[in-house]
Amino acid sequence: FSFHTELQVRITDINYAGHMGNDTVVSLMHEARYRFMAHHGLEELNVEGLGVIIADNVIVYKSEAFAGEVLMIGVAVTDFNKYGCDFVYQLTEKASGREVARAKTGIVFFNYQTRAVQKVPQSFLTLFAPERISS
């Protein structure tokens, strides 16, 4: 992963079982994706005038996380197709290096004016998949 960000598990992220709730992982993925995009000068609602919408989420839980722990979240972009790609994540507890989860978010690019899926913008390909740019 070429990009990493840190997020702390809050007490409000803890469920009745005493560990981080599964729904929190989706929120952490969203925040990490937002930070990744901002790091590259992008916004989820404006990549060459197109928005990003979520097509799917997959999470594989590896261990529990607890209030106060700091998670290091690695983010990368992979598996491009005509209309989108996958964001992949690895969540590890910073102090111990314990893996907490692996995840992916499938996204597609969307024109909110025409309400239609669009091809991956060239500028996004240039940043993350230069080998896929058509001449």
Model-found features: residue ranges?
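Hot-dog-fold acyl-thioester-processing enzymes
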Residues: F1-D56, F110-S135
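HotDog/MaoC-like acyl-thioester-processing domains
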Residues: F1-T5, Y61, A67, V77-S135
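Generic secretory/membrane-interface signal
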Residues: L7-V9, Y16, L50-G51, I73, ...
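Short, positively charged
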Residues: E43, G49-L50, G68-M72, V88-Q90
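Helix-adjacent hinge/juxtasegments
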Residues: A55, V60-I73
